Design a protein with these regions (language model features):
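DNA target-recognition domains and sequence-specific DNA-contacting regions of bacterial/archaeal
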Residues: 1-87
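Amphipathic alpha-helical coiled-coil/heptad-repeat segments
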Residues: 86-130
Length: 130
């Protein structure tokens, strides 16, 4: 295991933004106890924001476009802190994120079904032509 750590640096629900390299600008939601290195930015919602809404907002903002374009792309936290955007009140944010999460669950279910059907087709062809 590369980079194993036996303790955690963050606990709770966070949006994590890839800060360097190939994952620069990628956005994911994490929950529980996690260890984040200096190659990730942890975003925790305050009392005025919904974490899952921030996930969708930051993903939509395509943060990778703000990376330095050197040999290894990198996002500077101070550059991201200067970005401005208007957001609705928390209750509306929660409704929006719930709505989008419903779509994400449907998309994930369809992707699993497609993968299953693709595997079934491949197995059928192997049985047929072998």
């Amino acid at each position: 295991i590369r980079g194993y750590c036996d303790h955690y640096s963050h606990e709770g629900e966070y949006v994590v933004v890839g800060r360097q390299g190939a994952l620069c600008g990628n956005v994911r939601l994490i929950q529980g106890q996690n260890y984040l290195s200096e190659h990730a930015i942890a975003v925790r919602a305050n009392e005025k924001n919904d974490t899952k809404f921030l996930l969708y907002l930051l993903d939509f903002m395509n943060l990778g476009q703000y990376s330095d374009q050197g040999a290894q792309p990198g996002l500077a936290v101070n550059k991201l802190l200067r970005l401005k955007c208007n957001v609705p009140e928390k209750k509306t944010q929660s409704k929006i994120s719930s709505f989008l999460l419903t779509y994400d669950k449907q998309i994930a279910a369809q992707e699993r079904l497609l993968s299953f059907l693709t595997d079934q087709r491949k197995a059928f062809l192997q049985q047929l032509f072998i």
